[in-house]
């Protein structure tokens, strides 16, 4: 059972009565065949549901209205099998508030050269029916995705599946509640922002809860539940001597388990799926939540440190998008550099909170070590290196008049040396196109020091996310050149300025 089982995508066929009942019967027959095949063979993340043909303005309006009010409907896939006059779609598309994808396909793959006649031409009109539909989308300035390809083509399947992930994620985001335990880290700018504007733009709400309220729940957790969770730790992780039974830091592990259970209970009771903490606001907690946060992220919760609610929300969104895909997704921070001619590297980490979904090791190390910040007991944490391969880091920032999503494509590499004194999980990567260009572009665009790191998602996923939410995206990859990047920032300033 995944979040995608809670949603469905409606498959809508556009046509008209001009062609007569026999043509419409064939259109319906083709649509049923295509939907059944896609549900069976395309490995789509959620189910396609065929709706009745849209052949009149009233029918189309009813479909769009029903989609808006059906909580299970994540979006619409529209196929213009025949020509469908686009004025029929205006009222429905005007009210539609769900994501829309135009599937530019046709039932047959090859033309029947010897038998093709006007009946065939009238039945299979995607080539120009799709253009009529696309005009009204452009005329109405309505954002929608387009996938072209035969319905049996695997690349088309992948692109539809990727869009479905975005559509489901958008619906989940509309219900997302972010809990901030304490406030923003004092005097920090980029982690702050306009929470009202964020709720208007994305749909997620952000509210603060006193740490004392959390502490009350943590203290209510029974010793039996704590011991059961620690037994789970014993089976999942490599325990250091200090954390084992009779070890000098065993009590810290027990306390970390109590915090995890308390946090999870608090989040479940409040319906929260993302949260933040800050080391400056830990009153009543015996240690900074480290292990608890890591394990909650692995269960799908969004998180960011120092009150950074934008990154916490973005992590949850990307966790939903990547559900079931290979590779993990985590809170991350560009921490320090390795400058070496031709081999510049970035070491990413955080004080404690890196998600084990990106771990290279099957059983990360569970340890308790000193943390010289926060003024509390030594916290428990999982220590591991990260899987290698292509990845992205993404940052969502508030520019006042708009949101900007920054994405840097990176290549994670194996740590060339052991890190015996580094008591935290880490990731090591090469930034594309190179560290000087990537860091300068990131800084020029105002990118945050907190990011979401993902092996599971790619640049195309984040482009779709930005388009679906109608926000700016700036990309740093192997094609980036600083003069052109600076020009793009200037052009975006003008473009979004005109849209205010």
Curated annotation (Swiss-Prot):
Q: Does the keyword Manganese apply?
A: yes
Any one Gene Ontology cellular component term annotated for this protein: cytosol
User: Which parts of the sequence bind Mn(2+)?
Assistant: 306, 333, 350, 450
Molecular function GO labels: L-arabinose isomerase activity; manganese ion binding
Q: Which UniProt keywords apply?
A: Arabinose catabolism, Carbohydrate metabolism, Isomerase, Manganese, Metal-binding
A Pfam cross-reference name = AraA_N
Family matches, as InterPro entries: Ara_Isoase_C, AraA_central, AraA_N, AraA_N_sf, Fuc/Ara_isomerase_C, Fucose_isomerase_N/cen_sf, Lara_isomerase
Reaction catalysed by this enzyme = beta-L-arabinopyranose = L-ribulose
The pathway it acts in is: Carbohydrate degradation; L-arabinose degradation via L-ribulose; D-xylulose 5-phosphate from L-arabinose (bacterial route): step 1/3
List the cofactors: Mn(2+)
Q: Name one GO biological process term.
A: L-arabinose catabolic process to xylulose 5-phosphate
Name the Enzyme Commission number(s) assigned to this protein: 5.3.1.4
Q: Which CDD domains match?
A: L-arabinose_isomerase
**Cofactor binding summary note:** Binds 1 Mn(2+) ion per subunit.
Query: Could you give the subunit structure recorded for this chain?
Result: Homohexamer.
What's this protein's function? Catalyzes the conversion of L-arabinose to L-ribulose.
Q: Which family does it belong to?
A: Belongs to the arabinose isomerase family.
Name of the protein this chain belongs to = L-arabinose isomerase
| Species assigned in the record | Shigella dysenteriae serotype 1 (strain Sd197)
Question: What taxonomic ancestry is recorded?
Answer: Bacteria, Pseudomonadati, Pseudomonadota, Gammaproteobacteria, Enterobacterales
